[in-house]
Amino acid sequence: MGSVGLLYVGAVLFVNGLMLLGTVPVRSASVLNLFVGALQCVVPTVMLIQAQGDSSAVLAASGLYLFGFTYLYVGISNLAGFEPEGIGWFSLFVACAALVYSFLSFTVSNDPVFGVIWLAWAALWTLFFLVLGLGRENLSRFTGWAAILLSQPTCTVPAFLILTGNFHTTPAVAAGWAGALLVLLGLAKILAAPKAAVPQPRPVFN
């Protein structure tokens, strides 16, 4: 069930990346944040009800609230005109929690691929903290591109693989996933770099 919510997290991360780049207006992006945030609160609640005390099911559901609260916070704050610092510092909490979930994926859940994915989310939410919490606006373009490029391989792609029964998690697959995500972060840095000014020809006067 969690994979259904993960599918739409890929969509909202993509849109939020475009919002950071100034391509999508803030209020327009807020609507999708509210939809996905609500979904990511309902889905884990249903999972907890169905878990019947199964610790692994409870663990799987608990992390989804991090996304639900993030997107509800973003949607409400943007529509109400709140300052971004609150979201930024909450993002620091999410980043720290993601490190714990990554460790648990490697050690308890025996899921190295999601261990890598949680590390990617930790890095991304750290960027959100720097931009929104500390006002590091010079990182906005890099963060926007990082959100766009990481949204699909960390959310949409694994969601579809799980939904179709084609998700496999081994150390070798996790290593490949990690390499691909690092390449995408490098690409985000390149895309975020300021474009060099094109020299204009000097006018010639007779």
Curated annotation (Swiss-Prot):
Protein's membrane topology: Multi-pass membrane protein
Pfam family membership, one: AmiS_UreI
Source species, domain of life: Bacteria
UniProt KW keywords: Cell membrane, Membrane, Transmembrane, Transmembrane helix, Transport
Compartments, as annotated in UniProt: Cell membrane
Record has Cytoplasm as a keyword: no
GO CC terms, sorted: plasma membrane
Gene3D superfamilies: 1.25.40.600
Membrane-spanning ranges: 4-24, 29-49, 56-76, 86-106, 113-133, 142-162, 173-193
InterPro entries according to UniProt: AmiSUreI_transpt (IPR003211), AmiSUreI_transpt_sf (IPR038523)
Homology family: Belongs to the AmiS/UreI family.
Chain's role: Possible transporter that might be responsible for the adsorption of amidase substrates or release of their hydrolysis products.
Protein name, entry field: Putative transporter protein AmiS2
Organism name: Rhodococcus erythropolis
Lineage, opening ranks: Bacteria, Bacillati, Actinomycetota, Actinomycetes, Mycobacteriales
